[in-house]
Amino acid sequence: MLDIKFLRTNFEEVKAKLQHRGEDLTDFGRFEELDTRRRELLVQTEELKSKRNEVSQQISVLKREKKDAEALILEMREVGEKVKDLDNELRTVEEDLERLMLSIPNIPHESAPVGETEDDNVVARTWGEVKEFAFEPKPHWDLATDLGILDFERAGKVTGSRFVFYKGAGARLERALISFMLDLHTDEHGYEEVLPPYMVNRASMTGTGQLPKFEEDAFRIESEDYFLIPTAEVPVTNMHRDEILNKEQLPIRYAAFSSCFRSEAGSAGRDTRGLIRQHQFNKVELVKFVKPEDSYEELEKLTNDAERVLQLLELPYRVMSMCTGDLGFTAAKKYDIEVWIPSYGTYREISSCSNFEAFQARRANIRFRREPNGKPEHVHTLNGSGLAIGRTVAAILENYQQEDGTIIIPEVLRPYMGGKTVIK
């Protein structure tokens, strides 16, 4: 959520920056109307309440003096009715303004490339050499099915499309990657491990920006009004909702493994085979709470931490600086890390690393004090995948495949695989 005072005094500047996102700003224009009316109603209500108090005191005096107060009593009733009407209108205007504020995306950072679509994203850097195969490489779903380590067909029978059973070496590879990533981020990168709940309430989804805009993308448990988490970002960020932190606590860095659940409502017909787009998938998420002046340095560190996973796995990748039209709703700046997938003949996203500045913290009321009695300020929040496990499995299967259909296990994972060197 944006700062309403900043928006009020910089309306045209904010509008111009949001236009770079390619957003429909039709409703945005109502901000000035609603904000002005809200302030008018507050003034009118306070004036009438003040008058009501004065009249009430006058009535008390008249009654003590045993004088006729009927006219003032009637006047007070009229004032009371007007106050009630104004309070009702104020409540409606504030609800409309709150809904509008929750629907306004974050302001792009000045360093985000200006553009409309993914074609305008900028390559920040690449790492590793794309392997040239002496044979026609197979897609990971065929490799895994032939090896008996992934079973999409039976998962479809048990649940439906976009689900999978991991079996044998496939299940162990998934588990190995989870342990490897958590060990790396906690032991070498300084994150604290968190295992979060997989269900959250509506306030948590609103705090990180999934609601109200993206409710159709979420799995909701209607009886409780809980949501299955689309990412560990949601519960981990909301750990500190409605809290005031001390300066000495910052930065806070969490690494959280979780399963994630997404309806993929807008992805019908895309990536229908394999692990790239599943309704349920595992992920290690990196979440940071930092002082505002440190957030862009921390974004670079977070992105480097996610990249380190791919470097140790020796998987070629590139880092994209996302343009203003491809930032997503909540980010002020975002890097996508894309790993090379041979069967696609291109790079595919495996991590998004974002700086939300105070956007989430304002929605979730997460603040800190620089001094013991100082005025609370909003922290800046960041997060990134470190990494998406299923897509990492897909990248390993395809990049490490051999002509006979076996898979060489990356060296860094072998201690987690019981010393095995090959999946066959």
Swiss-Prot record:
Cited SUPFAM superfamilies = Class II aaRS and biotin synthetases, tRNA-binding arm
* Main location as per UniProt: cytoplasm
Q: GO biological process: any one?
A: selenocysteine biosynthetic process
* Localization of this protein: Cytoplasm
EC number(s)?
A: 6.1.1.11
GO cellular component terms, semicolon-separated = cytoplasm
Q: Which reaction does it catalyse?
A: tRNA(Ser) + L-serine + ATP = L-seryl-tRNA(Ser) + AMP + diphosphate + H(+); tRNA(Sec) + L-serine + ATP = L-seryl-tRNA(Sec) + AMP + diphosphate + H(+)
- Listed binding positions for L-serine are 231-233, 285, 385
What family does this belong to?
Belongs to the class-II aminoacyl-tRNA synthetase family. Type-1 seryl-tRNA synthetase subfamily.
Quaternary structure and partners? Homodimer. The tRNA molecule binds across the dimer.
Per the record, the domain comment is:
Consists of two distinct domains, a catalytic core and a N-terminal extension that is involved in tRNA binding.
Name it. Serine--tRNA ligase
What is the scientific name of the source organism?
Answer: Bacillus anthracis
